[in-house]
């Protein structure tokens, strides 16, 4: 009997950082005001060249490393997003192809 499970986890955050101090420069607010009300310190933004599948690919590589397996050992990719690369093609297929 086969079993299914999560053997590793991974994440990826884009390099572009926008801090509360950056907000202070463009709108009437402060780091303290934002932080006390939301807990947010910084936000990460993908570049215009990066798609959802690029971010997911970075996370997948970390998950594979965390699981101590090879890319070829991955049997299934489940990727849920509200921001797909394309309307008609799932980002999971793109990540699978990149792996």
Please name every model-derived segment:
Residues 1-78, 97-99:
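Conserved "HGTGT" condensation-loop signature of ketosynthase/thiolase-family condensing enzymes
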